[in-house]
Amino acid sequence: MLIIRNRQELKEAILKQKKANKTIGFVPTMGFLHEGHMTLVSHARKETDFVVMSVFVNPTQFGPNEDFDAYPRDEAHDAKLAEEGGVDILFVPTVEEIYPTELATKLHVIKRVSVLDGADREGHFDGVVTVLTKLFHLVNPDNAYFGQKDAQQVAVVSGLVEDYFFPVNLRIIPTVREADGLAKSSRNVYLTETERKEAPVIHAALQLGRQLIDSGETDEAKIVQVMTDKINEQTSHEKIAYLALYSYPEFTPVTDWTKGIIIAAAVKYSKARLIDNELINVKRR
């Protein structure tokens, strides 16, 4: 496995693979890798000839009161897991390498972001599409791999790819979970022992919502209330940041219960904000 830190070296390595007619799979991450990330790598390994992973904590997707400086980082750990997982190139740039000068242009997401994380984290998805635009140009992948846990991000990135004709196929991989149902996340390390014990209730509540919809329930308020009551059976969380249903991938009110729907939750704990979701009537790419 090659560890590359600068753009030019990465572009040269990618060009070499392209000249050899190798297909490239790309797994963009912010590091502190866990089994969820490695599942993406596993899919890339099976579906493409050459796997590139980026580890970059992107400052432009963090708000002024968010955890950029505190976000967990462990390059040695990441490199070990990446190599064991079959990554061919680990791209670990500095902030200066990705943002060498002040931006002269700005990407602004105008759809699919008025609710959920888009509403709670103003400017977050602008930062996401900015860094992914840069990374897609550098890596020039055939496939890019994302986890369903970040379903709103996936919808936004799908819009980016469609709007700007990026020649990349997005592969959306089901959320990887702990044995008790908690979605794997780098932020799980922030949970206290009690919070970690109770956090699986998020997934349990979402499953209740799915069961209601699958049984024919269309009273949105009732569905949300049942899920809210389930989460509030546990007491370690500070608040439910959101618990809602929307059409997917549009993130507009549900008008047709036979089409794509997302049930999404974000729950705030003392030092972590956890997100999770269930997708209904949605085909993964």
Swiss-Prot record:
Signal peptide, first to last residue: none
Listed transmembrane segments: none
Function of the protein: Catalyzes the condensation of pantoate with beta-alanine in an ATP-dependent reaction via a pantoyl-adenylate intermediate.
Binding site for (R)-pantoate: Q61, Q153
Active site: H37
Pathway listed: Cofactor biosynthesis; (R)-pantothenate biosynthesis; (R)-pantothenate from (R)-pantoate and beta-alanine: step 1/1
GO biological process: pantothenate biosynthetic process
Any single GO CC term annotated in Swiss-Prot or TrEMBL for this entry: cytosol
Keyword Magnesium in record: no
Subcellular location per the Swiss-Prot or TrEMBL entry: Cytoplasm
Protein name: Pantothenate synthetase
Pfam assignment, any one: Pantoate_ligase
Enzyme Commission no: 6.3.2.1
Lineage: Bacteria, Bacillati, Bacillota, Bacilli, Bacillales
Residues annotated as binding ATP: 30-37, 147-150, 176, 184-187
Further details from the record: The reaction proceeds by a bi uni uni bi ping pong mechanism.
Subunit structure: Homodimer.
Alphabetized UniProt keyword annotations: ATP-binding, Cytoplasm, Ligase, Nucleotide-binding, Pantothenate biosynthesis
GO molecular function: ATP binding; pantoate-beta-alanine ligase activity
